Each structure stands twice: as C-alpha cells, then as structure tokens.
C-alpha cells in the first residue's frame, strides 16, 4: 500500500511540477518495487558487499539480493530477455538454483573466501572451491556482485 501511495504522489507531483522525481520517492520504490535498504545491506566496499550477500542469502532476501546487490545491467537484461519482464520468475529461478546445491558453496565462499580487491573490482576465491569465484564491480559508488557467465 505504501508503494501505491508513493506512486500516486509522484504522478500528482509530476502533473503539477514536471521536474525530476524526489530522491526519497525513488529510494523508497527501489528496483522492481524492492526498497533500497543501505543500512541493513551496505555495499560501499567489497567486504560490506560480501556481508550483505551472505545476510541476504541467510535471511532468504533473494528479491533484495537480485534487485540491489547483483549487477543491475545483468539482472535487467536477464529479466527482460529470459523471463519476459517478470522479476518474480528471476527470483524463483535463483531460489531454485540455491535449493539445488548452489547455496552451500556460495555461503562457504562468502564466509571463507579470500578477498582480492582493486579500486574498481574485487573477487572472492577459495582453493577448496576450485572454479567457484564471486566477482564484484564498483559502479556509481556501490559494489555489485557480477555475473561470471558471459
């Protein structure tokens, strides 16, 4: 209901004042209707992104992880081209992959992986998980998990 009220406010505001959207309204609506929560899921450093990813997985906040912690351009393209614009299908697919065996190595890598970071990119690696790497990138002053499959 809160999101509906914000959208209505923005429409009325735009009709009478066609300028940029208020930053607070954009922040509350968020991506795919998922509000940004920088206090609970900080991503201002690779280490904080690591902790936020682990927290999102452990608390089953897959929607949040995909909307805000994963590479936005990859998620947008995947939702549009693979899931016919349906974000819920992307979330369901990711949940299914986690259930089918991805969750355990992902958690292990997020907890135990060695972080190698540069100014604009980072990666988590663990020799015990040979080919399993988490890549990260800095974009618009936020760190995101990148898709390794290009």
Regions found by a protein language model. Name each.
Residues 4-12:
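Sec-dependent N-terminal signal peptides
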Residues 18-59:
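Short, low-complexity N-terminal intrinsically disordered segments enriched in polar/charged residues
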Residues 21-28, 130-150:
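Short beta-strand edge/turn micro-motifs at domain boundaries
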Residues 41-42, 74-133, 149-150:
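Surface-exposed, charged secondary-structure patches
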Residues 45-53, 61, 65, 83, ...:
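Stable alpha-helical elements in mature extracytoplasmic
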Residues 53, 57, 65, 115, ...:
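Hydrophobic beta-strand residues in large extracellular and virion-surface proteins
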Residues 61-76:
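Short, well-ordered alpha-helical segments enriched in acidic and aromatic residues
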């Amino acid at each position: 209901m809160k999101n509906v009220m914000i959208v209505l406010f923005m429409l009325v505001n735009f009709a009478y004042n066609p300028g940029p959207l208020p930053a607070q309204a954009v922040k509350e609506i968020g991506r795919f209707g998922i509000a940004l929560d920088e206090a609970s899921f900080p991503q201002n450093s690779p280490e904080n992104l690591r902790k936020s990813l682990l927290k999102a997985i452990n608390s089953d906040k897959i929607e949040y992880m995909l909307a805000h912690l994963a590479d936005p351009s990859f998620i947008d393209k995947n939702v549009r081209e693979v899931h016919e614009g349906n974000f819920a299908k992307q979330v369901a697919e990711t949940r299914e992959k986690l259930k089918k065996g991805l969750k355990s190595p992902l958690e292990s890598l997020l907890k135990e992986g060695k972080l190698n970071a540069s100014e604009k990119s980072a990666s988590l690696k663990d020799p015990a998980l040979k080919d399993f790497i988490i890549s990260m990138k800095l974009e618009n002053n936020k760190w995101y998990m990148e898709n390794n499959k290009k």
